[in-house]
């Protein structure tokens, strides 16, 4: 029997041992994917809410396989490896097949020299067989040290030398472990240095090979691989030799071989790499990331996956930063700044307590401009500055930025036309050039005039404040008049168009056309503007229409309308654009619907275990292992998830609509499972416009109580402060007290803490 055939047979025997396929077709008592896609309501989301204790990750986990594939030659999604804020970034393919491999299509940018990894005596590309390769894992669940295992057995006898009386011989098949991280030293950051370790964790004898594009023009001397121009491509430990234009290392069980790969070639060979270098640099890199995450608001919930996700999303965004520029992605067509998406990511960092960093990151956004979207950007930039001022309280920064933000303010004040009081027509959205009077643009601009008034008062800019107040009132009247004249009442609920005065047809199903999909993607700005008065009949028209006409899937924003989507399929989700819809759910106090989006994103909007998102992902699976998604990773997708987590724990509300929050809501949308007996919810030093807030919630259901320690903000006292204890189904709160003082508590577990100040100890007495 030929060696190749023997190896193939041995591989076939390993399928059951290593396969990790997602049995999405075997879900019981669930609508089919076709039924769910065809429904105008969120079938899976509604079913999740009906489960005991409400939505959960486990409910969504196996309905579909996760995002896994991209429209690149390397097919498996890429993982960016970078030092914090480094300008040079490496690309690891998530099946372990190589580093800095070329994408091929126009969507992907080439970075560094492609390095391909091969294993076994047949030099098979690592990770080629999906049933043999594990999904990548981060160290401790979140640290950016990737680990991937791959089964590829070696023959256990000399070819041809087979004894006549051969006996059956079962043996452990070779399993290789690949580990990689970006070195965070100054040198590593400058050169995109990736350190790699191959280990044989099972089996007897293993072989690893490293291949470059320049296999016939390379030299390998003193463990340094150079190209024909004498540039250093990589360094190795003493395990490696060169054969047939590739580096090779033989491994016995428990042995390792290490490499240092340069994305940007160094100027000289002053950097030293040897057998101990991988571990030495690994320890320093781990400490770098621990120190960075220690600066953030600290959250601990009784769901390790959530704890890993928020830490890793912060790490990812530090890796996507190029200096002070929050790019949308890296090493693809989205390696650039966008005002709306960049703002989402920066404001998420601000919400997690990176105040000084966020001020620096905001400057490139304030300087950004794109023709045809000037008024859209003006509203975004003003709202960004308002939030930065509210959280940091840094008036000096606001004054320093005044030439930038006042230019945007004057654009809104001066460009409204006399005829209808609205801003001039501009692009329907970034991807659709059709000029319209955009409700998205006008609503956002009006809200910025509303919310900037407290800031102008704080800066004592009285003449400008007077001008803004007058304009905001006139603008609000004109905008409501335009919207009410444009609403389509033939649908239930009535349809609110983005294109005012243009007779935009109702989109139903929303994703049946491209324009409908973009209507769905951008209408969050309208929701966030709260243009309709509280309690008015129109207040919930938009959110109700989204939910009843196919705008939501597993709590995530849907899109579609492409007859022949090459990477996407006809139906997909663009979760990151649902941030304002999610915040509106909190405003309307619908925690279970909010959790549908939270867990839908975690289970089906991100890669499994590595938490990497793209701009959008298909709903139809490619195969049982995964679905396509577009140009990952994505800083706004990361920002979306950590913003949801932050707000389900700590949320501010402007109930009186005066442009400034006056209500603080704590733990208003936590999972009921998080307060099962013995579990704890904790958030420490979360920045708000009132100051930092912390709480620790300990469930002692077995003793009939829940204990809560709260540290209320000290910078400014909210007019109203509420804390909610969301108990598992079947449990009720009997009373709440602080010491001997009774605290008013509602049936849903909401306690009124408005009269309290400083640190507070609460006891909720509970029963079944």
Show where each model-derived region lies.
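Bacterial N-terminal signal peptides that target proteins for export
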Residues: 1-7
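Terminal accessory carbohydrate-recognition/targeting modules of carbohydrate-active enzymes
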Residues: 7-10, 18-301, 657-768
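Aromatic-rich carbohydrate-recognition surfaces in CAZymes
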Residues: 251-253, 257, 282-283, 336-422, ...
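Active-site-proximal structural scaffolding
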Residues: 26, 141, 191, 225, ...
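Non-catalytic carbohydrate-binding regions of carbohydrate-active enzymes
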Residues: 24-46, 463-505, 534-692, 696-702, ...
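Substrate-binding groove/exosite segments of carbohydrate-active enzymes
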Residues: 288-400, 427, 437, 502, ...
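The feature captures the catalytic groove of carbohydrate-active enzymes
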Residues: 242-278, 372-376, 410-477, 509-515, ...
């Amino acid at each position: 029997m030929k060696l190749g055939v023997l190896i193939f047979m041995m591989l076939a025997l390993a399928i059951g041992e290593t396969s990790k396929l997602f049995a999405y077709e075997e879900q019981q008592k669930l609508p089919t994917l076709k039924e769910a896609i065809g429904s105008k309501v969120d079938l899976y989301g509604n079913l999740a809410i009906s489960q005991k204790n409400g939505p959960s990750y486990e409910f969504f986990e196996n309905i579909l396989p996760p995002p896994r594939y991209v429209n690149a030659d390397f097919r498996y999604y890429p993982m960016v490896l970078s030092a914090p804020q480094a300008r040079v970034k490496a690309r690891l393919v998530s099946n372990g097949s190589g580093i800095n491999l070329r994408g091929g299509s126009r969507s992907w940018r080439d970075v560094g020299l492609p390095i391909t990894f091969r294993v076994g005596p047949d030099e098979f590309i690592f990770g080629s067989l999906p049933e043999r390769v594990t999904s990548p894992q981060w160290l401790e669940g979140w640290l950016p040290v990737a680990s991937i295992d791959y089964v590829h057995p070696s023959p256990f006898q000399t070819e041809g030398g087979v004894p006549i009386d051969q006996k059956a011989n079962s043996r452990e098949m070779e399993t290789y472990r690949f580990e990689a991280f970006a070195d965070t030293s100054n040198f590593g950051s400058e050169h995109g240095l990736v350190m790699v370790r191959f280990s044989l964790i099972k089996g007897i004898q293993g072989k690893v090979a490293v291949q470059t594009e320049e296999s016939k023009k390379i030299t390998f001397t003193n463990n340094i691989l150079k190209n024909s121009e004498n540039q250093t491509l990589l360094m190795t430990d003493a395990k490696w030799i060169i054969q047939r234009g590739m580096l090779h290392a033989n491994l016995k069980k428990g042995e390792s071989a290490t490499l240092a790969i340069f994305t940007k070639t160094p100027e000289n060979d002053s950097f030293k790499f040897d057998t101990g270098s991988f571990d030495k640099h690994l320890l320093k890199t781990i400490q770098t990331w621990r120190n960075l995450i220690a600066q953030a608001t600290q959250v601990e919930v009784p769901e390790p996956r959530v704890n890993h996700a928020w830490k890793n999303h912060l790490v990812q965004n530090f890796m996507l930063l190029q200096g002070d520029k929050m790019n949308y992605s890296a090493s693809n067509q989205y390696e650039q700044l966008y005002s709306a998406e960049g703002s989402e990511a920066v404001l998420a960092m601000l919400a997690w307590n990176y105040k000084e960093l966020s001020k620096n990151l905001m400057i490139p956004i304030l300087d950004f401009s794109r023709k045809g979207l000037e008024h859209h950007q003006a509203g975004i930039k003003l709202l960004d500055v308002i939030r930065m001022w509210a959280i940091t309280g840094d008036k000096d920064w606001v004054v320093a930025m005044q030439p930038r933000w006042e230019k945007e303010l004057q654009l809104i004040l001066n460009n409204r036309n006399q005829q209808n009081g609205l801003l001039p027509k501009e692009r329907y959205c970034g991807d659709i050039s059709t000029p319209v009077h955009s409700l998205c643009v006008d609503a956002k601009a009006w809200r910025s005039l509303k919310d900037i008034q407290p800031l102008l008062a704080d800066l004592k800019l009285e003449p400008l404040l007077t001008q803004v107040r007058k304009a905001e009132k006139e603008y609000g009247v004109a905008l409501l008049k335009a919207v009410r004249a444009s609403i389509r009442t033939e649908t239930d609920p009535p349809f609110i168009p983005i294109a005012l005065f243009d007779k935009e047809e109702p989109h139903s199903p929303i994703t049946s056309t491209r324009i409908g999909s973009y209507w769905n993607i951008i209408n969050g700005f309208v929701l966030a503007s709260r243009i309709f008065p509280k309690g008015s009949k129109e207040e919930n028209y938009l959110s109700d229409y989204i939910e009843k006409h196919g705008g939501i899937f597993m709590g995530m924003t849907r899109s579609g309308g492409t007859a022949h989507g090459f990477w996407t399929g006809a139906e997909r989700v663009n979760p990151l654009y649902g941030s304002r819809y999610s915040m509106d759910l909190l405003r309307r106090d619908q925690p279970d619907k909010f959790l549908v989006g939270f867990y839908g994103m975690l289970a089906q909007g991100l890669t499994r275990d590595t938490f990497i998102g793209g701009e959008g992902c298909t709903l139809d699976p490619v195969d049982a292992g995964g679905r396509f998604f577009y140009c990952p990773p994505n800083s706004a997708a990361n920002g979306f998830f950590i913003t949801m987590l932050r707000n389900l724990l700590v949320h501010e509300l402007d109930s009186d609509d005066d442009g400034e929050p006056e209500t603080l809501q704590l733990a208003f949308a936590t999972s009921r499972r998080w307060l099962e007996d013995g579990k704890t919810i904790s958030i420490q030093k979360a920045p708000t416009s009132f100051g930092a807030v912390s709480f620790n919630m300990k469930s002692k259901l077995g003793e009939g109580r829940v204990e809560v320690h709260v540290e209320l903000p000290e910078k400014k006292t909210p007019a109203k402060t509420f804390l909610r204890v969301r108990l598992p189904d079947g449990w009720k709160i009997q009373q709440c007290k602080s010491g001997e003082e009774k605290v008013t508590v509602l049936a849903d577990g909401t306690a009124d803490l408005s009269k309290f100040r400083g640190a507070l100890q609460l006891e909720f007495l509970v029963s079944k």
